[in-house]
Amino acid sequence: PKGFGYPTQITIMTFSVDKESDLQVLALNAASAALFVSNIDINTSVSAVRAAKIDGELVLNPTLSELNRSTLDLYLSGTKDDLLMIEMRSMGGERVDSSLVLDPLMDPTFSAPIITTHVSNAIGEDELIAIFEKTEQLLFESNAKYEEAFKAFKKETMEIEYKAHLLNEEMVKYVRENHFADIKSAMNQMAKSERSTALRSIRKKIILEQEDWNEAELKDAIENVKKEQVRAQILNERVRADGRALNEIRPISISTNVLPRAHSSCLFTRGQTQALVVLTMGGPKDAQMFENLTDNGTQNENFMVHYNFPGFSVGEASPIMGTKRRELGHGNLAKRALEPIVNLDGQTVRIVSEILESNGSSSMATVCGGYMALRAADIETSDVIAGIAMGMVSEGNKYAILSDIMGLEDHDGDMDFKVTGSKEGITAMQMDIKLGGISLNVLKEALYQAKEGRAHIIDIMVEAEKNIEFNDGVLPSTDFFHIDPSFIGEIIGQAGKTIREIIEKFEVAIDI
């Protein structure tokens, strides 16, 4: 509830696993049920639904084995009235293109070679909206059933004091009437650190004018007027703080293989967001091993995307420590976006994105830079993939959808909707709503505006591809060939002596 400021911990523990149940869906439903029946004043449940597409058919709440055969993984959560969160990815696979037509007079034992092509299985906007409609209905129905089923077990609501955060209306009025133009000018400072400095100067100026005012309360008042100004300008003037139109993309520059000793690299800059994306290739033994509760054994991850967000990228002197939750999430989203378009076939690829400066959409810069790094390493891809972050500002029945949002619009807006894909379809998406819900009509409009933005970015990336110069001196090559099994012992040698000598002498990796 609003004003509930008490530390609350929900603990979800897995005691038994059948290797077919979706733990992510079950965990959210269990957490929601625990909150709903508690003595906290919560009267709405939240649940999750997963959708898969198997052999062209939609399957709701698939088992894990069914999900492994799917070309779509869509995860939605919400209440009985509103959609709150979406995560989606397509899963690449092999498409059978053709096989040799056999002459009836040929040897019947002859086996014709089958020709396949790797495809991303990106899904189009219209098909995705149709799937949303079906899964959303199941989501709404399940929440209504949950609430009805758990109502009898709900504890009596406890009487607690809620912490009201009240603005000083006198300060808000004074700031609005006397310093609105100053705040509007400060919003033109696009970097987060520059905006903060400008707003701090305004605060100090007002304190000199009103010496008896509380500085913390004044800071809240200035923040409130700033948010009003940003949102009103977008809704009423249809112009953003940096002067862009609602669907306008910031200027983009792309440089590839800027690091001469890396296998490949890309410096991707969009506005004041810049990512240095570096790709390293390896063999099968370089894959990362991991285990899941629902797996039967150790798995190998041969495509990795890691995202690092140092403090200096936003002008903060913060210590460089372990990977944070946000960095894990952004890296995972970029991996989901790019993985469907590559068929590594025995190779291992690690992509690392170092954010050098950030003013919003750094995860989408990672996706764009990651694709360019793949091409700069001469790795075949089935599609050109770009990413764009969409936003929204809404007041009553009035709303505006924003393309390529910057940090200010993410902070003061109502939606953070990241969409990645080709010109034809979507490979991954992630949506978080601050409003408490979004209608399918608004979601559809955002998807199509994102498609236009992706097409613009992809055109720039395709042009940049033409200027790629490979780092031939350091770029590894992979050869696959067959040897007579009877010679394997000689190649390995006594206790591995021969194969080690070959590896050291020729600086190669050998996997038999």
What are the roles of these predicted feature ranges?
Residues 45, 154-298, 476-490, 498:
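Extended amphipathic alpha-helical scaffolds
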Residues 1-8, 14-16, 20-21, 80, ...:
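Glycine-rich, flexible beta-strand/loop modules in the N-terminal catalytic cores of phosphate-handling
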Residues 41-187, 374-468:
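Mobile "lid/hinge" segments at catalytic clefts and subdomain interfaces of large enzymes
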